[in-house]
């Protein structure tokens, strides 16, 4: 094999054999020099990155007579090494010297030069902190330690590279900046909390707007046809009506809609149909009539008991302006208050078209008020309308006794709210079929003759059994106004048609 690719040992042995041919002295000298070169260590083995020694490959022979190379570490790195390798992370100046000489043989010579540099770096660099000696251990000199903020001054923990010169003021400035950034973040978080509350408030407002159908309001009345005293009374009554409607919806919402039906879905959540339970016009006469009816309801609790035995319902007050139904032949003459007997069905029952008001004004000339289309009745029962106290029972019902005051009885469900007690109108109103555009039609079934007869009989029984209490109602009627004087309602028909046309046109 060629000597270039041969083993280093075989080449040495070959060199020794050839050299032995010239003389024994020269051969011994060559062998000793080769063994010395193989045994010599590479001067940079202690700083090498590789675990193996460079002398194994014969690299130590050319450098065997040169001095040891200086370590590639700065004096700051050497001092930091000594401090971090100490037991308590603090060491004296003499301890630093000992660590450096034990670790790096280069510093074993020329001690005066590098030890002076160590003291100089300890004094000038702020990363080294001098700690007074407080223990009773033997020795002299203070301890040296590293500043807590300077532990990361070396890049990735390597002592060969330092990021920058450590300065305490820079560290303090960085800390202040970090505190300021944290304070700014806290302020931003504090500003975001009111925004969150506002967002929740907007969501709640949207939720209330989505459920605004529960709180129905009356359509705005065009008060141009009213003047003076009537305008103020109408505005006040409409505002009171809105408040009562909202309170009763919250208090008795479950009672008004007892079960799930298609009619309940269409009636309750349709604004135009939902108004069937409220009167469209509220004035002094209507308020007086309602108050009179309430007083009659309180004074005649016994009459309510008799009516309950007949109809299995609780006595209730109906609106006194409802015209007679188709199933009963009503008569009206004289100037006495109205007598109505109406057995109500469930609350919010029946259909209603916006063209027809819940009630018709009673003519003052003593003639019977006849609806426009008597062939269509939105009532489930019939009513008897009299001015002189003489009742004619429809379909076999008996007549009632005479009197000068009104007797108003009806029999709805016992758990109705206060709003329905005052404003329930849709059970006894006549409806006009059709609309200006033909979009709405009345779809209620006609009244039953047997129900009309039963209601008339109940009214006659109550009137005949409680005629001795009529003087209370005469006084009340005198104080609140005559119910027969209803001529101020003549404006109602064209006025209702006017704003209902706009309601249908714009979907109000």
UniProtKB/Swiss-Prot annotation:
Outline the segment boundaries, as ranges, of region: Disordered.
319-412
Gene3D superfamilies (UniProt xref)? Winged helix-like DNA-binding domain superfamily/Winged helix DNA-binding domain
Name the residue ranges with Low complexity bias. 375-389
Q: Which Gene Ontology molecular-function terms are recorded?
A: DNA binding; DNA-binding transcription factor activity, RNA polymerase II-specific; RNA polymerase II cis-regulatory region sequence-specific DNA binding
PROSITE patterns xref list: FORK_HEAD_1, FORK_HEAD_2, FORK_HEAD_3
Tell me which residues form the DNA-binding region.
69-160
Q: Where in the cell is it found?
A: Nucleus
Q: Where is the composition biased (Gly residues)?
A: 390-404
Q: Which GO terms describe its cellular component?
A: nucleus
Tell me the keywords, alphabetical order: Developmental protein, DNA-binding, Nucleus, Transcription, Transcription regulation
Q: Kindly name one Pfam family recorded for this protein.
A: Forkhead
What does the tissue specificity note say?
Expressed in early blastoderm embryos in anterior and posterior gut precursors, and, later in a subset of cells in central nervous system.
Q: Which InterPro entries would you find in this protein's record?
A: Fork_head_dom, FOX_domain-containing, TF_fork_head_CS_1, TF_fork_head_CS_2, WH-like_DNA-bd_sf, WH_DNA-bd_sf
- Gene Ontology biological process terms, A to Z: anatomical structure morphogenesis; cell differentiation; regulation of transcription by RNA polymerase II; specification of segmental identity, head
Q: What does this protein do?
A: Required for the establishment of head structures. Required to function as an early patterning gene in the anterior-most blastoderm head segment anlage and for the establishment of a specific head skeletal structure that derives from the non-adjacent intercalary segment at a later stage of embryogenesis. Binds the consensus DNA sequence 5'-[AG]TAAA[TC]A-3'.
Q: What is this protein called?
A: Fork head domain-containing protein crocodile
Organism of this sequence: Drosophila melanogaster (Fruit fly)
């Amino acid at each position: 094999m060629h000597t270039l690719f041969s083993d280093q040992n075989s080449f040495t042995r070959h060199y020794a054999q050839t050299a032995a041919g010239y003389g024994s002295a020269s051969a011994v000298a060559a062998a000793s020099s080769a063994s010395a070169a193989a045994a010599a260590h590479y001067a940079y083995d202690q700083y090498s990155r590789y675990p193996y020694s460079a002398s194994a490959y014969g690299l130590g022979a050319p450098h065997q007579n040169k001095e040891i190379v200086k370590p590639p570490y700065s004096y700051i790195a050497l001092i930091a090494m000594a401090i971090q390798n100490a037991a308590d992370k603090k060491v004296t100046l003499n301890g630093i010297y000992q660590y450096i000489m034990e670790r790096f043989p280069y510093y074993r010579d020329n001690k005066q030069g590098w030890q002076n540099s160590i003291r100089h770096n300890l004094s000038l660099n702020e990363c080294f902190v001098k700690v007074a000696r407080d223990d009773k251990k033997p020795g002299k000199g203070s301890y040296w330690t590293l500043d807590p903020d300077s532990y990361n001054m070396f890049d990735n923990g390597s002592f060969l590279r330092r990021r920058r010169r450590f300065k305490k003021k820079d560290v303090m400035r960085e800390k202040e900046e970090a505190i300021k950034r944290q304070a700014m973040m806290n302020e931003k978080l504090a500003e975001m909390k009111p925004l969150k509350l506002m967002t929740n408030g907007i969501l709640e407002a949207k939720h209330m707007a989505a459920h605004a159908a529960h709180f129905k309001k009356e359509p705005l009345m065009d008060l141009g046809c009213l003047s003076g005293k009537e305008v103020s009374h109408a505005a006040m009554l409409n505002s009171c009506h809105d408040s009562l409607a909202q309170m009763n919806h919250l208090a008795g919402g479950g009672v008004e809609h007892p079960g799930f039906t298609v009619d309940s879905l269409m009636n309750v959540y349709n604004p135009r149909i939902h108004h069937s339970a409220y009167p469209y016009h509220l004035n002094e006469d209507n308020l007086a009539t309602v108050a009179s009816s309430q007083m009659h309801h309180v004074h005649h609790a016994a009459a309510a008991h008799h009516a309950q035995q007949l109809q299995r319902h609780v006595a209730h007050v109906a609106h006194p302006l409802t015209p007679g139904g188709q199933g009963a032949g009503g008569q009206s003459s004289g100037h006495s208050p109205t007598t109505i007997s109406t057995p109500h069905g469930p609350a919010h029952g029946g259909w209603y078209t916006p063209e027809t008001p819940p009630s018709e004004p009673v003519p003052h000339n003593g003639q019977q008020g006849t609806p426009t289309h008597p062939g269509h009745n939105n009532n489930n029962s019939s009513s008897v309308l009299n001015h002189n106290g003489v009742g004619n029972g429809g379909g076999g019902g008996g007549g009632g006794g005479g009197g000068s005051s009104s007797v108003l009885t009806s029999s709805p469900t016992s758990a109705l709210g206060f709003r329905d007690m005052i404003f329930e109108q849709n059970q006894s109103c006549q409806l006009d079929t059709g609309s200006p555009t033909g979009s709405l039609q009345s779809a209620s079934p006609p009244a039953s003759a047997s129900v009309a007869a039963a209601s008339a009989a109940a009214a006659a029984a109550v009137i005949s059994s409680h005629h001795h209490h009529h003087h209370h109602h005469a006084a009340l009627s005198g104080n609140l106004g005559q119910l027969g004087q209803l001529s101020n309602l003549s404006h109602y028909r064209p006025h209702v048609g006017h704003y209902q046309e706009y309601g249908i046109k714009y979907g109000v």
